[in-house]
């Protein structure tokens, strides 16, 4: 079975199992991430009240923590839900939106990482660099200066917190601190829509809900997400029509499209090779 066969099988497994993805996420992207969860094959729930999060996460396949619209109450809810998820072996995917932009965002994300065992961190180069202490400037929630060495920053962060780190950008990099996979799928029009990084995070969460190799799950999720964008772009005339076509492409993404179009490169070997061709 090739790497792309495995990605296609994992995508089908999400559709078959329909895992519940519990989001504690930001107001800006709630509707979009709920729809993307549905389109990829999962079931979304947005629940952030401290009185219910422990009960809600117990029914979930994965937990998404996204600090985009940050508040102290939500951080406490994230910790309550995250501790319960850890007790039950439910994977947590952290989206450290705006880490490095303010001291509150940076410290809140570090608190989550120090308190909880996170399965995957998905962020842009600026956010990952800021959390790793290796450069990166974030203005608002966008990286305006990348980390000095995004891969090195991701590896440092992965080793420090015993997690998988996915740095998204022109080329996505996914590492557990030693193994490294690069994902070359995507399209520049993703940058014209707010919240696409958050949507990528929820796809990763859906994949981790049914696959315990979190490095593979994160890379597979990003490959499917980026491939859907590539398939949508020729049908679009601008950002609005691209968004509609993108949702359709995620929903209809088929195994044969994944086998033909996913582009994942294994950077862990001495001579980097396209694992899809192995």
Curated annotation (Swiss-Prot):
Keyword Kinase on entry: yes
Classification via SUPFAM superfamilies: Ribokinase-like
Cofactor(s) of this protein: Mg(2+)
Annotated residues for binding of ATP: 122, 168
Protein's UniProt keywords contain NAD: no
Enzyme class: transferase
InterPro entries, A to Z: Hyethyz_kinase, Ribokinase-like
Alphabetic keyword roster: ATP-binding, Kinase, Magnesium, Metal-binding, Nucleotide-binding, Thiamine biosynthesis, Transferase
Protein's pathway: Cofactor biosynthesis; thiamine diphosphate biosynthesis; 4-methyl-5-(2-phosphoethyl)-thiazole from 5-(2-hydroxyethyl)-4-methylthiazole: step 1/1
Enzyme Commission identifier(s): 2.7.1.50
Protein residues bound to substrate: 46, 195
Catalytic activity, as annotated: 5-(2-hydroxyethyl)-4-methylthiazole + ATP = 4-methyl-5-(2-phosphooxyethyl)-thiazole + ADP + H(+)
GO MF annotation terms: ATP binding; hydroxyethylthiazole kinase activity; magnesium ion binding
GO biological process, one term: thiamine biosynthetic process
Task of the protein: Catalyzes the phosphorylation of the hydroxyl group of 4-methyl-5-beta-hydroxyethylthiazole (THZ).
Protein family according to the UniProt entry: Belongs to the Thz kinase family.
Protein name in the entry: Hydroxyethylthiazole kinase
UniProt organism field: Chloroflexus aggregans (strain MD-66 / DSM 9485)
Lineage start: Bacteria, Bacillati, Chloroflexota, Chloroflexia, Chloroflexales
Gene: thiM
């Amino acid at each position: 079975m090739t790497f792309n066969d495995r990605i296609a099988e994992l995508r089908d497994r999400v559709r078959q199992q329909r895992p519940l993805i519990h989001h504690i996420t930001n107001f800006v992207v709630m509707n979009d991430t709920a729809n993307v969860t549905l389109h990829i094959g999962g079931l979304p729930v947005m629940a952030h009240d401290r009185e219910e999060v422990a009960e809600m996460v117990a029914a979930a396949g994965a937990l998404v923590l996204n600090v985009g619209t940050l508040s102290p109450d939500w951080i406490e809810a994230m910790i309550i839900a995250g501790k319960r998820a850890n007790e039950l072996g439910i994977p947590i995917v952290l989206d450290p939106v705006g880490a490095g932009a303010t001291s509150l965002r940076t410290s809140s994300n570090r608190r989550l990482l120090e308190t909880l065992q996170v399965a995957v961190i998905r962020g842009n180069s600026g956010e990952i660099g800021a959390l790793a202490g290796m450069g990166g400037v974030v203005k608002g929630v966008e990286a305006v200066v990348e980390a000095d060495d995004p891969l090195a920053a991701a590896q440092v962060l992965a080793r420090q917190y015993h997690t998988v780190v996915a740095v998204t950008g022109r080329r996505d990099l996914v590492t557990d601190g030693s193994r490294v996979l690069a994902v070359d799928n995507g399209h520049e029009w993703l940058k014209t829509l707010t919240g696409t990084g958050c949507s990528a995070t929820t796809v990763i969460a859906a994949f981790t809900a049914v696959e315990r190799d979190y490095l593979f799950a994160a890379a597979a999720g990003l490959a499917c997400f980026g491939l859907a964008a590539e398939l949508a772009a020729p049908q679009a005339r601008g950002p609005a029509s691209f968004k509609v076509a993108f949702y359709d492409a995620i929903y209809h993404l088929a195994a044969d499209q994944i086998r033909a179009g996913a582009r994942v490169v294994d950077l862990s070997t001495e001579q980097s090779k396209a694992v899809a061709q192995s």
